[in-house]
């Protein structure tokens, strides 16, 4: 299995990316292709690691402040070269660089799976249960039609079933209330269309995401990104409060020591690094979009995520799902569009 890793554009430079690759290679067998500035990377690559990876040199990359459309023009940028390697035989790509550039190039260079109108970013959210919830779209499409959300539901269902091995995953539609009549026009129209699918649970509220009420939560990219960023902010704030309170007194320190295991589980569930990255579903190869501030652990987990996606053949599963849509469901979608 060949995995392409974009070295450039992450907030903390190439070091965490290289360390993440090194750790993953200690635990998994795969071929790693590193794309980026060789001069910046070489000081951090040991002789042992150098013998395990292939290095593609380029100094160009799409900076965070640049427009995503720059990516298609810059054919020597790390993400463009990486995407070409993926298109021409590699199995997956991981990038912690410019997410808009990654999404745009993946769609243009790899192509959309037949039947998918818009690819979506799929992210894992912590829950009180033993397994996380899947949320999509987490930011790829800020303005959506009901048909897009139907696609997201199908892709999220297949991802939960194939990659996460959830048995008969349930899909919920994010709304401001559980009742069928709740939601804006987008939610109401999508709800009508999703009723045709056996996996549809109904509307869910924001709090349900973390209760594990459903396995997959569907929403437009604007709402999904707000949910994601809010969750990250709340988790970070709670962590800071805990740290300050623990340091405030001897009793607090002793109590924290007794609860060390519980705190460890809480940290693991709420730490973005443990989830790796966010798969871009709906394109013809596996692409993982990692957080710009990814540390070595996040990159390591993103690689494991990519390996799972490839081994489960999730792109093929999504393709088959769209090819085998029930005619009555397709007719239902057409009726909704005509109405």
UniProtKB/Swiss-Prot annotation:
Alphabetized GO MF terms: phosphate:acyl-[acyl carrier protein] acyltransferase activity
GO cellular component labels: cytoplasm
Keyword field: Cytoplasm, Lipid biosynthesis, Lipid metabolism, Phospholipid biosynthesis, Phospholipid metabolism, Transferase
Gene3D superfamilies in alphabetical order: Isopropylmalate Dehydrogenase (3.40.718.10)
Any GO BP: fatty acid biosynthetic process
Family matches, as Pfam families: FA_synthesis
InterPro entries in UniProt: FA_synthesis, Phospholipid_synth_PlsX-like
Pathway(s) where this gene product acts: Lipid metabolism; phospholipid metabolism
Record's subcellular location: Cytoplasm
Domain of life, per lineage: Bacteria
Subunit structure: Homodimer. Probably interacts with PlsY.
Recorded family membership: Belongs to the PlsX family.
Entry-linked PANTHER family: FATTY ACID/PHOSPHOLIPID SYNTHESIS PROTEIN PLSX, PHOSPHATE ACYLTRANSFERASE
Name of the protein described by the UniProt record: Phosphate acyltransferase
Native source species: Helicobacter pylori (strain G27)
Source taxonomy: Bacteria, Pseudomonadati, Campylobacterota, Epsilonproteobacteria, Campylobacterales
Protein encoded by which gene: plsX
């Amino acid at each position: 299995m060949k995995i392409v890793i974009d070295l450039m554009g992450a907030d903390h430079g190439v070091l965490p990316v290289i360390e993440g690759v090194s750790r993953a290679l200690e635990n998994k067998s795969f071929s790693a292709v590193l794309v980026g500035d060789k001069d910046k990377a070489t000081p951090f690559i040991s002789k042992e690691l150098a013998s395990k990876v292939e290095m593609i040199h380029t100094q160009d990359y799409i900076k965070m402040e640049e427009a995503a459309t720059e990516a298609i023009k810059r054919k020597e940028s790390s993400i463009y070269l990486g995407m070409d390697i993926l298109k021409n035989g590699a199995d997956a790509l991981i990038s912690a660089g410019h997410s808009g550039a990654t999404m745009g190039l993946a769609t243009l260079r790899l192509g959309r799976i037949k039947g998918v109108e818009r690819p979506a970013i799929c992210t894992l959210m912590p829950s009180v249960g033993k397994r996380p919830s899947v949320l999509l779209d987490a930011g790829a499409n800020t303005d959506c039609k009901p048909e897009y959300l139907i696609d997201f539901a199908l892709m999220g269902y297949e991802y939960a079933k194939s990659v996460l091995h959830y048995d008969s995953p349930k899909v919920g539609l994010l709304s401001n209330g559980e009742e069928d009549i709740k939601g804006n026009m987008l939610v109401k129209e999508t709800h009508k269309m999703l009723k045709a699918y056996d996996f549809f649970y109904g509307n869910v509220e924001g709090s349900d995401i973390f209760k594990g009420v459903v396995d997959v939560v569907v929403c437009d990219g604007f709402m999904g990104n707000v949910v994601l960023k809010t969750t990250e902010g709340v988790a970070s704030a709670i962590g800071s409060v805990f740290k300050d309170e623990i340091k405030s007194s001897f009793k607090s320190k002793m109590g924290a020591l007794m609860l060390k295991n519980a705190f460890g589980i809480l940290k693991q569930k709420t730490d973005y690094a443990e989830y790796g990255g966010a798969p871009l579903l709906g394109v013809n190869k596996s692409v993982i979009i990692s957080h710009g501030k990814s540390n070595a652990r996040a990159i390591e987990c993103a690689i494991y995520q990519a390996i799972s996606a490839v081994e489960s053949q999730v792109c093929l599963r999504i393709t088959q799902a769209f090819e085998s849509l029930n005619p009555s469901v397709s007719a239902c979608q057409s009726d909704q569009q005509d109405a």
